[in-house]
């Protein structure tokens, strides 16, 4: 009942392009879908860890467990995530020992998962992990220190990976990193930076810039 008036229509112009919007987060602690009138049409009585609800293939999604937490120098991170359907049925449970934060995405429909994770070596939110979809095994962990070196590694949360996406045709990972003001592309097989979109004064004359096609933004 407390969610009945959670979404309020303040202004409406024309018919919405989307029948339903699925959301979860701070003020909406349970995954829920609402229509263009702001009416809740679907809700799951499972409260995930605050980073959200990640749709994957076959009308399923990944959610992070909020009770199984790993202490970090920043905030506790979940170490467990579930593959669920919209009826709340759990198909798989995955354990990521160094913790999960911010984003999870499929590499291919039904394939392995890319997870924003942590090095736990005095730093957090600085790694990308690949999780085997069938076995749950951690197939690979890429520490962003390998990509950017240590020039900016001057605080606990030096990268702060926010989002991930994967291009299966090119074997490339796209990422956004808040604390180094960058969107970038990495060759996932070779662990090489392909390009960056970032602030010019931050990245010019850096060693890796010679092997990356860089696009700079004028902060003005």
Predicted ranges, named:
Residues 1-220:
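Histidine-/acidic-rich catalytic cores in large beta-rich domains
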């Amino acid at each position: 009942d407390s969610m009945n008036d959670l979404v309020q229509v303040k202004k409406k112009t024309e018919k919405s392009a989307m029948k339903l919007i699925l959301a979860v987060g701070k003020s909406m602690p349970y995954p829920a879908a609402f229509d263009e009138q702001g009416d809740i049409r679907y809700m799951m009585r499972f409260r995930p860890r605050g980073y959200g609800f990640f749709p994957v293939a076959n009308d399923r999604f990944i959610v992070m467990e909020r009770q199984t937490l790993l202490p970090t120098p920043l905030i506790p991170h979940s170490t467990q995530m579930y593959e669920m359907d919209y009826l709340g049925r759990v198909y798989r449970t995955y354990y990521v020992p160094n913790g999960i934060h911010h984003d999870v995405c499929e590499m291919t429909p039904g394939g392995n998962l890319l997870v924003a994770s942590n090095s736990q070596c005095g730093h957090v939110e600085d790694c990308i992990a690949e999780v085997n979809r069938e076995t749950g095994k951690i197939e690979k962990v890429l520490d962003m220190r390998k990509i950017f070196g240590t020039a900016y590694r001057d605080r606990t949360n030096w990268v702060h990976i926010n989002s991930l996406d994967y291009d299966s045709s090119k074997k490339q990972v796209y990422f956004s990193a808040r604390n180094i003001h960058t969107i970038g592309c990495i060759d996932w097989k070779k662990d090489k930076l392909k390009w960056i979109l970032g602030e010019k004064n931050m990245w010019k004359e850096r060693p890796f810039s010679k092997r990356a096609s860089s696009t700079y933004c004028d902060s003005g």
